[in-house]
Curated annotation (Swiss-Prot):
Heme b b562 binds at H83, H182. Heme b b566 binds at H97, H196. It is found in: Mitochondrion inner membrane. The chain crosses the membrane at residues 33-53, 77-98, 113-133, 178-198, 226-246, 288-308, 320-340, 347-367. This is Cytochrome b. The cytochrome bc1 complex contains 11 subunits: 3 respiratory subunits (MT-CYB, CYC1 and UQCRFS1), 2 core proteins (UQCRC1 and UQCRC2) and 6 low-molecular weight proteins (UQCRH/QCR6, UQCRB/QCR7, UQCRQ/QCR8, UQCR10/QCR9, UQCR11/QCR10 and a cleavage product of UQCRFS1). This cytochrome bc1 complex then forms a dimer. Keywords: Electron transport, Heme, Iron, Membrane, Metal-binding, Mitochondrion, Mitochondrion inner membrane, Respiratory chain, Transmembrane, Transmembrane helix, Transport, Ubiquinone. It comes from Hemigalus derbyanus. One of its GO terms (biological process) is mitochondrial electron transport, ubiquinol to cytochrome c. One of its GO terms (molecular function) is metal ion binding. GO terms for cellular component: mitochondrial inner membrane; respiratory chain complex III. The lineage of its organism: Eukaryota, Metazoa, Chordata, Craniata, Vertebrata. A ubiquinone binds at H201.
Length: 379
């Protein structure tokens, strides 16, 4: 068995990635989220495939086809809610994974980090298009508002929006193409994830101390496979608690009303995992400025490696930087809350302050903390 594992061309790749992979002996549970993201992706592809067998991407029948899945298809309701809530867990794991990378300085693996950012954008695009497919009120108006942001691009904006819509408004053509892209993107994400792992295995994993762990490596299997199974069981438990007890907890009640272009919902808002970016978008009165801030709120991750001023890689032994990191986390929670609130006083002011804080912490306070810590350690 050992010989086949180490000699067969295909088995050798699996062996070097998941079995005999030399792994630092001190990585914590924060390193569990990579494998959980892989599980989430597989789960989403499988549930999505079964949903696509019964879904129709036509404005006249999309909403009723989703109802049909929930009422008439065998276990359709559980597949539908596993897919919807699976997306929420996917994003929870994503945010934890990115946060861990920022805290422990994993962004110094520049190729792995940049492909990770590309993966984040791809998953966000997929989730947005998936939210449009049930063709409820929030699906329709969410699609209208978000695609309309492209009209802020000077000169070509309006043409670009109409090209994406396939007409003069969000309609049948838009829904059909969103379904096509929503179906193909997870496979592109899978390919990107494989490249993400390829680059990670070129350097080996980082560890909480941020120091080289070449002296102390252990095989991935059985030590971390068994550790990952615990994370997997917890993930499935949380997912099934959500699906079986409160499947609509994270959804919007407006999406149970069929899409109506003549009736605008009082508060148009995206799913909870986009609310932080939506709050940043809304905090700037200018349309183009808001769109740029929205893009930069994610793209700022790409310049984090350039802003690393500390002589230590990880934040494990840097209390000042730790304070800044947790301040950023609290700030993101405030932005998420504000994104779901109506545009009125005092939420507008809180949103603007939180948006300013978000960019200030990342661009100014964190690099300054690193410099101060270097001086305190007389480096």
């Amino acid at each position: 068995m050992t010989n086949i594992r180490k000699s067969h061309p295909l088995a050798k790749i699996i062996n070097e990635s998941f079995i005999d992979l030399p792994t630092p002996s001190n990585i914590s549970a924060w390193w569990n989220f990579g494998s959980l993201l892989g599980i989430c992706l597989i789960l989403q592809i499988l549930t999505g495939l079964f949903l696509a067998m019964h879904y129709t991407s036509d404005t006249m029948t999309a909403f009723s086809s989703v109802t049909h899945i929930c009422r008439d298809v065998n276990y359709g309701w559980i597949i539908r809610y596993m897919h919807a809530n699976g997306a929420s867990l996917f994003f929870i794991c994503l945010f934890m994974h990115v946060g861990r990378g920022m805290y422990y300085g994993s962004y110094t693996f520049s190729e792995t980090w940049n492909i990770g950012i590309l993966l984040l954008f791809s998953v966000m695009a997929t989730a947005f298009m998936g939210y449009v497919l049930p063709w409820g009120q929030m699906s329709f108006w969410g699609a209208t508002v978000i695609t309309n942001l492209l009209s802020a691009i000077p000169y070509i904006g309006t043409n670009l929006v109409e090209w994406i819509w396939g007409g003069f408004s969000v309609d049948k053509a838009t829904l059909t193409r969103f379904f096509a892209f929503h179906f193909i993107l997870p496979f592109i994400i899978s390919a990107l994830a494989a490249v993400h792992l390829l680059f990670l295995h070129e350097t080996g994993s980082n560890n909480p101390s941020g120091m080289s762990s070449d002296l102390d490596k252990i095989p991935f299997h059985p030590y971390y496979t068994i550790k990952d199974i615990l994370g997997l069981l917890l993930l499935i438990m949380v997912l099934m608690l959500l699906v079986l007890f409160s499947p609509d907890l994270l959804g919007d009640p407006d999406n149970y009303t069929p899409a109506n272009p003549l009736n605008t919902p009082p508060h148009i808002k995206p799913e909870w995992y986009f609310l932080f970016a939506y709050a940043i978008l809304r905090s700037i009165p200018n349309k183009l400025g808001g769109v740029l801030a929205l893009i930069m709120s994610i793209l700022i991750l790409a310049i984090i490696p350039l802003l690393h001023t500390s002589k230590q890689r990880s934040m494990m032994f840097r209390p000042l930087s730790q304070c800044m990191f947790w301040l950023l986390v609290a700030n993101l929670l405030i932005l998420t809350w504000i994104g779901g609130q109506p545009v009125e006083h005092p939420f507008i002011t809180i949103g603007q302050l939180a948006s300013m804080s978000y960019f200030s912490i990342l661009l100014i306070l964190m690099p300054i903390s690193g410099i101060i810590e270097n001086h305190l350690l007389k480096w």
